[in-house]
Structures are given as structure tokens and as C-alpha cells.
Amino acid sequence: MKKIVALVLALMLALSMLTVATAETANPVAGKKVAYIMLLPSATIFQMWKDSCADLCAALDVEFDFYFCDGDFNRWMDTINTCAAAGYDGLLVSHGNQDGSYVFLKELTEKYPELKLVCFDTQFYTDGEYQKIEGVTQLFQQDKSLVTVLLDEMIAKFGEGVRLVKVWRGPNYNSPFDRREVGWQEYEAAGKIVTVGEIQPLQDSVDSANSVTAAYLQSLNREDVDGVIAYYDLYGQGVYNAIFENANFNGEAGEALPMASVDIDQVDVTNMQTRPDIWYAAGTTDWTLNGEIAMRLLLLELAGEYGVDVVEIPGSAILASALKEDSTVENLGEIAGETYGNLSYLSVADWMPADLLHK
């Protein structure tokens, strides 16, 4: 009789352990609703981000929406407010500007205390100091490194004191540009680079970057500049077109003017393959992986497993000379350095897909 009782107790214990294990691995985010809200216009890299977010959400039965705000900060704030009021469980918000984002998002979290937030490339800054919002994870590219890896390549090509033109919008247009500017200023202060001039597109578009760069080149002597750095690849496409269309800078009369840009998409890869003497390099991270990193952080918050305040992903230089004939924006990991596509930045949990969606 004692043996029977012991067997029954052992069976009950095994079943209880199985029940606990099953509960522990149950999906805690099924049925949740989240959105990705980007300040900037849609671009290939942001679509890569969005698609990886959508794939992960689909795998975990999470409803996913996305919104691009075409560089309009008021529209970005309105979209966030609308989603919060509509009962979204979590928001992944991207590229808020330095001045207004902290106050706005802090008030949002106070008004909707159950709403979970992950912020990408968005600094919390007010009254001359960087701030923190309790319970909100900030994910960044190491924006400074996205510029400095390009500056390092220009220095390797031309030596210290290389003369460069900078293409950006700022200061305080958006947080990523301001963070990239830190790297530029450090190199300039150290005498590693010399700023020949600055170009500021009027809009976040290829056409705007093309027109302002074309006008600027008319006032510039080729012998007075070594290269151009664009803080955003959309601007880079406009810069490339302006150089390509100008006989004094495209290689028809002397050496072509080399340029490099932050971020990358398929248009950039094609241009780098076509004219590596013009589009010399790009500084980037793996945008497909970035989206999954960010969404995993948000889903962890929704599951009550918040663990970190800040995550930073280092940049890699993609050299035109390293591209293969079959290189695309999707397979850059084949030719990029080890910092590109580093899976160590991915959060994991028992209830998340064990086989990572993006490797």
C-alpha cells in the first residue's frame, strides 16, 4: 500500500512540475497590440526593421501596426497619442528629436501608466541634462561610431587633416543626427579632419539633397576638398547624383570626389557597385536584426520582464571595394566585419521563438 501511495505522490509531483513548466513557457504576450511609429519617411532600412518586427509579432500572436511620419514631429506626437488613447499595449517609437521627446514621452507615460515603451534613437534631454524615464528602454545605434567608422576610412585614404564636407540637418533636428555630430566634432577638435563646409537639405528627400548639393558644388573647387560625408543615406543618394552629374567632380576632369553615408539600402549598394570611386563607403548596422532586437525588448516589457535601460548597437563600415557582384542590402553580413549582425544584442526568453527569426 505504501508503494502505491508513493507512486501516486510521485506521479502527482511530476504532473505538477509539468504544469509549472508549461505555465512558465506559455506565451504571455499573445493577443497584445503594438505599433512601430517612425518620425522619418519610409526607407528600405526602416521597411527591413518593420518587416522583422511584424514577423516576430506574428510568431507570438501579437497584433502589429506601423506608421511613418515623414519627418513631421507634430504628426509623430499625434500618432503616439492616438495609439495610446486607442488602447495599444506597447509602442516602439523611433527618432524623436532631442528637445521635445523627453517632456512629451514622460507626460505620456504618466497619462497611460500601463503603456509599455521602447524608444529607438531617441534621447531624453531637458534643461541641459540627459534624463531617464522609469521603465522605458532606450535602444540606439552607436550613432557616433556610424560617423567615425567613415571618418576613419577617409583618414586611411587621405591622411589626418582630410578635408570634408558634411551633409546633415541640425542641430536638434533629430536625436540620431545630433549623436552622429558628436563623432564629427571630436575628430575635428583632434585635428583628424577639417570641415570645408556644410550642406543642409531642406527636406528629407533625395531631390532636396540633390538640389542643395548641386548648388553647393558650383561654389567649390575640386582641389579644395577630399570627400563628403552624409549623415543619412537618403541624403547620400542626392549627393551621389549631384557628384555624378557634375563633370568637375565625377571623374571626367581629374579624380572623382568620394563620398560616404550613414545607413544603407539597395540603391546605395547598387551605386557603390557602379561607381565605387564616388560612393566609397557606408556606415551601418543590420537593420533586419535591429527591428527584432527592438521588438524583443518591447515584448519583454509587456511580459513584465523589463531588464535594461539602454542598449547600443555598434556601427560597421561597408566598403564599396568589398562588395561582391551578388551583394545586396540583405546579405551584407557576408562581407561586413564581425560587429555587423551581432546576435549577442538579442534578448531571449523561454516563450520567445527558440530558433531566432533572423540570423
Model features per residue range: what roles?
Residues 1-33, 63, 85, 107-114, ...:
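Short, low-complexity disordered leader/linker segments with a strong preference
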Residues 28, 136-165, 209-212, 263-269, ...:
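Hydrophobic alpha-helical segments within soluble ligand-binding/sensing domains
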Residues 30, 168, 286-287, 293-359:
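Hinge/cleft segment of the Venus flytrap/periplasmic-binding protein
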Residues 31-52, 56, 65-78, 88, ...:
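Extracytoplasmic "Venus flytrap"
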Residues 45-59, 146-150, 175-194, 208, ...:
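Short, solvent-exposed amphipathic alpha-helices that sit
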Residues 58-69, 164-166, 188-206:
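Short beta-strand elements in bilobed, periplasmic/extracellular small-molecule ligand-binding domains
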Residues 91-112, 117, 183-184, 202-271:
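Hydrophobic alpha-helical
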Residues 106-145, 268-274:
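Flexible loop/hinge segments that line or gate small-molecule binding clefts
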